């Protein structure tokens, strides 16, 4: 098989039809998967020795949340080092990063893999990966044909990165090339709430306005502050962090504004405060609602006039600091209750941002779970860490009162438990590995069954086995709970399982 002019033209047209970059990238890899008749395709962006998925087709949704560090993925490292098409033999000893991440093929290894590095000039900007379950999946395509595809993809990605750079207000070093921008914090999520938050961050980052970031505990307010700072003209200067909730009243003023030698017992030398450290940069005040009213008044003066006084010093110091503040409280209610100054609230909330709780972010929980699974895989030296269908279903229906932080800890704990009960370096997280309170789950969806040559009885039994297996996984292998979920008698369920060969 070879590409016709019509096929290449169709790929080029699809790259122009999308409204935004994300839509175009998705059209590209979906079209490639159809043209190449492969099982999975992915477009990855290269940034700081890691590949970041931009669009996928045929892969588990959680792949979009993963960050593939080169040191943990030898195949991707080989692609990054190559200047041309990379074909991995079916018997390659290098593990495939997508093993266990192709839906319906979780237990099988990827057999055919092609990597296409994408360049803008001499700079590596990304890669296309193509995967198939058949060893000879890509043998019919020549390297020259694959290079044409890589050229089309590289052009689309290069244009997107240039436009992204022009739209941002980052001040790049004078010698920097267009693809050597300051590394920015990755905010994982495609839900409407997160998409809106990212747009608002882009808008406010270019200004010098103070920002009040509100959200429940564990939603990632500090990450939002980092993203604002890194996308601002102050990115080359420091971002200084201060947790107001952890400040004892006796040292809070010194921490903020500094002190001079002899100002109080223990002040054996002059010391700069957080405002001085953040001069020409950004100061992030976490849990600002915990500050005393006295300190709120002094903070207000700094925001109004731009000068500070060290404790024990009569002189004023000028500082140029942008303040980002975060709180998990409703500061409007705190103002009404007399616990927070109204004038300070208005000074801080010139551009308020609200971080949505995880329970309102839909499928973002699966993307974030994929990110944390990849983190655990690297830290523990495992070959792969993936979620079972039952585990994914559980995560999507748990409300996560502790938000993203709770999800992170839950994934780490589950990996440790799963690793302890499984031999080898491959970990599959099941529902029973998560210690969540009672979660009401909907009946499991029927797994997609490929059309195969089998009679109705065989197909029915296969469906019954899969349904029972998923229900057991979701109920920690408790047969009584499984029977209740499936709305059947437990004795009948045991008999059916025996007939299906699932029990002795």
UniProtKB/Swiss-Prot annotation:
Molecular function (Gene Ontology), one example: DNA-binding transcription factor activity
PANTHER family: ANAEROBIC NITRIC OXIDE REDUCTASE TRANSCRIPTION REGULATOR NORR, TRANSCRIPTIONAL REGULATORY PROTEIN
InterPro entries according to UniProt: AAA+_ATPase (IPR003593), GAF (IPR003018), GAF-like_dom_sf (IPR029016), Homeodomain-like_sf (IPR009057), NorR (IPR023944), P-loop_NTPase (IPR027417), Sigma_54_int (IPR002078), Sigma_54_int_dom_ATP-bd_1 (IPR025662)
Keyword flag Glycoprotein: no
DNA-binding region coordinates: 479-498
Coiled coil: none
Function text: Required for the expression of anaerobic nitric oxide (NO) reductase, acts as a transcriptional activator for at least the norVW operon. Activation also requires sigma-54.
GO BP of this protein: phosphorelay signal transduction system
Residues with 4-aspartylphosphate modification: 57
Protein name stated in the entry: Anaerobic nitric oxide reductase transcription regulator NorR
Keyword terms, alphabetized: ATP-binding, DNA-binding, Nucleotide-binding, Phosphoprotein, Transcription, Transcription regulation
Source species of the chain: Shigella boydii serotype 4 (strain Sb227)
Residues the entry annotates as binding ATP: 215-222, 278-287
Pfam hit, one: Sigma54_activat
Sigma-54 factor interaction domain: residues covered: 187-416
Gene: norR
Pathway(s) per entry: Nitrogen metabolism; nitric oxide reduction
């Amino acid at each position: 098989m070879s590409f016709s002019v019509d096929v290449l033209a169709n790929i080029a047209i699809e790259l122009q039809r999308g409204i935004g970059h994300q839509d175009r990238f998705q059209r590209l890899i979906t079209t490639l998967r159809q043209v190449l008749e492969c099982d999975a395709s992915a477009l990855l962006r290269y940034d700081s020795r890691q590949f970041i998925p931009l669009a996928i087709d045929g892969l588990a949704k959680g792949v979009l949340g993963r960050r593939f560090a080169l040191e943990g993925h030898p195949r991707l490292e080989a692609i990054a080092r190559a200047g041309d098409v990379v074909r991995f033999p079916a018997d390659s000893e290098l593990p495939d990063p997508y093993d266990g991440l192709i839906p319906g093929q979780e237990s099988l290894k990827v057999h055919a893999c092609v990597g296409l590095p994408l360049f803008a000039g001499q700079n590596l900007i990304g890669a296309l990966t193509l995967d198939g379950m058949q060893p000879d999946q890509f043998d019919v395509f020549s390297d020259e044909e694959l290079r044409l595809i890589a050229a089309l993809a590289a052009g689309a990605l290069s244009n997107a990165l240039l436009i992204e750079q022009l739209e941002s207000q980052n001040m790049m070093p004078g010698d920097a090339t267009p693809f050597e921008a300051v590394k920015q914090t990755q905010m994982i999520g495609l839900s409407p709430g997160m998409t809106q938050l990212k747009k608002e961050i882009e808008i406010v980052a270019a200004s010098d306005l103070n920002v009040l970031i509100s959200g429940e505990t564990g939603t990632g307010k500090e990450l939002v502050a980092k993203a604002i700072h890194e996308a601002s003209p102050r990115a080359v200067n420091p971002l200084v962090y201060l947790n107001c909730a952890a400040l004892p009243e006796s040292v809070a003023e010194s921490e903020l504004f500094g002190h001079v030698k002899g100002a109080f017992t223990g002040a054996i030398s002059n010391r700069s405060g957080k405002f001085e450290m953040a001069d020409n940069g950004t100061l992030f005040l976490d849990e600002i609602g915990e500050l005393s009213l006295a300190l709120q008044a002094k903070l207000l003066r700094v925001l109004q006039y731009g000068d500070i006084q060290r404790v024990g010093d009569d002189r004023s110091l000028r500082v140029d600091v942008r303040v980002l503040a975060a709180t998990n409280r409703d500061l409007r209610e705190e103002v009404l209750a007399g616990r927070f100054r109204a004038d300070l609230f208005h000074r801080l909330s010139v551009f308020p941002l609200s971080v949505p709780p995880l329970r309102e972010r839909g499928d973002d929980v699966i993307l974030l779970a994929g990110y944390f699974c990849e983190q655990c895989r690297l830290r523990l030296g495992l070959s792969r860490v993936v979620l079972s269908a039952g585990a994914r279903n559980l995560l999507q229906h748990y409300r996560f009162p502790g938000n993203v932080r709770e999800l992170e800890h839950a994934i780490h704990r589950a990996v440790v438990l799963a690793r302890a009960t499984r031999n080898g370096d491959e970990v599959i997280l099941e529902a029973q590995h998560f210690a969540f309170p009672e979660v009401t789950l909907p009946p499991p969806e029927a797994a997609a069954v490929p059309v195969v040559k089998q009679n109705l009885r065989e197909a029915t039994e296969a469906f019954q086995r899969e349904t029972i297996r998923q229900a057991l996984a979701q109920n920690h292998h408790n047969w009584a709970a499984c029977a209740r979920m499936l709305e059947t008698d437990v004795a009948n369920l045991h008999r059916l399982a025996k007939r299906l060969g699932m029990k002795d």
